[in-house]
Every structure is written in C-alpha cells, then in structure tokens.
Amino acid sequence: MSHFTKKSDFMKNIHDDISDIYSSLRKMQSARDQLDDLESRLLDVKFSKILELSKRTIKLIDDTEFKLISPKQKTFQDVINFRNQLDAQFLDLLSKVDGNVPPITSGEMTRYKDLKLEWLKIKTGYDQIVSNIQDINTKLIESSVPFISRGGE
C-alpha cells in the first residue's frame, strides 16, 4: 500500500469519527429539546419517575455535549476563553495530516489513537443517553402519557 493510500485511509478514519461525533451531537440536542418539552407537560406527581429520569438524561446530554464541543463559543475570540473540545482536536489533526506530505508520522498516529480512545470513552455517555431514552419511552407507554398534549392541561 502506498503512502498516499495510507494517508487517504487515515484521513477517512478521522473524518468518519468527526461525522460520528456531529451525528451523535445532533441526536442528543434533538433529544434534549424533546425532553424539555416533555418535562413542561408532565407536571402530575404520578409522572415523577419519568421526570427524574428525564432530568438525569438532560444533565448527561449537557455533560457529554460539553466534552465534545465548546457550546459557549460564540465568536472567533472565544477560542481564547474556552478550551477546544474533542471535535476541534479531531479537526486540527485532520488539518495537520492533510497539510503534510506522506508518510503519516508516528506522532499523528499516536494523536489519533489518543483522540479515538477519548471519543470511545465519551461515547459511553451517548450510549447511556440512548438507553435512558428507551427507558423513558417505555415508561411513557406504561403510564399512558398522551403523545400530543391538550394545550397544557
């Protein structure tokens, strides 16, 4: 396999991980919006277990999101104030690999392995979120919670 092919495959792996991170983020952010809406509709005490799990899941989403991106960054100057998170570190590595002439350096490979391990650790939080959402959906069905509220009743 040529150095250019190895570099291309390596860059594809990095790109796939970045795509996986952003896909997971979109799903978590959508789930958080839905859970926020659900909480506003479940004010009855009989739904307290659902609400508790929902609140824990939102907290887990917030914590996981913060490890992946810097949600507080709003302008280019915020890079100074807020630490780059995993997405920016992957993008930085991709940029460095793309800008270098093959072969891939051992430092780039080591950095990728470190970032990949970090992503896999963080992904356990995402997996727990998915599991919590399945539990919430089961509890909603068991509790006969109406899918569409009747205007805040």
Regions found by a protein language model. Give the residues of each.
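C-terminal amphipathic alpha-helix
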Residues: L86, F90-E153
